[in-house]
């Protein structure tokens, strides 16, 4: 019998490859539907930005971050100026009560969570609770406007949030976790706006680092066009980034239908400190709530590279 016949070729479990793929796709789809249903129930709780809790008296005075250097000029115009000097009227960040104490005893930095496209901070409700249970005392999430039309502008706004968070917590550096578009915004801030002096580790979940070709009917939205593989934004992020001090941990899944191809959620750049973490059978929405991924996020936030430790000690 011809072993190349798809009907006779089996996987490790003895199931024909075609049937195995169909079953796996069905499982991922059912999980995505369940995650979406739960998220729709939580979505109203994250519509509004929460005001930050007052800083605790025990929070030490903020350490001064190293001076920032201007990022290189982009392919389509002058470089975007990094945020320096006093920050005008900081926009409040959303705290997970009662997360207004000093940094955890294990040395965890404050964590700031960035949601994805057409979403809000409620997507991180399970992750925030999980981090709190495991000792993180400063876990915040922010909402950027659903009308955001430029990743660069959103990254500049993120910079203002980060400065306010550092001032309030007394920490010179923080960690970021971004889902989908949120990871791209965090990357632009750290890589192009000098945010690496503030961001020790950026964890991205299902972020289109190489761009994605999925959902072609959404191209009229300018942010979607920026997430296409050959966009000016992708070209800018591919430019040299010598000396970038942020450590990047990129989680990607072989079953993410929004990442086309799925490997586009991997991060590859010769100048960046990168760890790519592949997971199997996890859909796009589930990447923010999957137990395996959440455990991986905790591990990534606890594991600090030598380069990051050197910067913190500076």
PLM ranges: what are they?
Residues 1-111, 125, 134, 309-314:
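Flexible, membrane-associating and regulatory peripheral segments of lipid-active enzymes
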Residues 107-109, 242-248, 271-275:
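Short, proline-enriched alpha-helix->beta-strand connector loops that line the catalytic pocket
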Residues 111-122, 128-245, 251, 258, ...:
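Serine-dependent carboxylesterase/thioesterase catalytic core
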Residues 127, 260-267:
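Short alpha-helix in the alpha/beta-hydrolase fold that links the catalytic acid
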Residues 137-138, 270-287, 297:
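Catalytic histidine neighborhood in serine/cysteine hydrolases
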Residues 254-257, 279-281:
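Glycine-rich beta-alpha junction loops
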Residues 288-302:
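Post-His helix in hydrolase/transferase enzymes
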């Amino acid at each position: 019998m011809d072993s190349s016949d798809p009907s006779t070729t089996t996987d490790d479990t003895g199931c024909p490859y075609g049937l195995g793929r169909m079953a796996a796709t069905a499982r991922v789809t059912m999980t995505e539907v369940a995650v979406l249903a739960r998220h729709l129930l939580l979505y109203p709780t994250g519509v509004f930005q929460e005001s930050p809790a007052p800083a605790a008296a025990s929070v030490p005075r903020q350490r001064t971050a190293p001076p920032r250097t201007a990022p290189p000029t982009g392919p389509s115009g002058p470089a975007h100026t990094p945020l320096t000097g006093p920050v005008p009227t900081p926009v409040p960040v959303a705290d997970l009560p009662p997360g207004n104490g000093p940094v955890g005893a294990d040395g965890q930095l404050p964590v700031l969570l960035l949601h994805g496209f057409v979403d809000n901070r409620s997507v991180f409700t399970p992750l925030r609770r999980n981090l709190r249970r495991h000792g993180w005392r400063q876990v915040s999430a922010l909402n950027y406007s659903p009308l955001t039309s430029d990743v660069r502008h959103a990254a500049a706004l993120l910079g203002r949030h980060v400065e306010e968070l550092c001032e309030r917590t007394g920490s010179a550096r923080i960690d970021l976790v971004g889902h989908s578009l949120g990871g791209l915004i965090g990357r632009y801030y750290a890589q192009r706006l000098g945010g690496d002096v503030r961001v020790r580790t950026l964890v991205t979940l299902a972020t289109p680092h190489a761009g994605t070709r999925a959902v072609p009917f959404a191209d009229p939205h300018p942010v979607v066009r920026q997430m296409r593989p050959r966009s000016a934004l992708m070209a800018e992020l591919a430019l040299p980034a010598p000396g970038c001090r942020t450590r990047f941990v990129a989680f990607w899944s072989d079953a993410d239908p929004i990442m086309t191809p799925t490997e586009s959620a991997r991060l590859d750049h010769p100048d960046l400190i990168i760890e790519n973490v592949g997971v199997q059978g996890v859909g796009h929405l589930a990447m923010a709530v999957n137990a395996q991924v959440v455990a991986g996020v905790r591990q990534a936030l606890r594991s600090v590279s030598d380069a990051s430790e050197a910067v913190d000690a500076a």
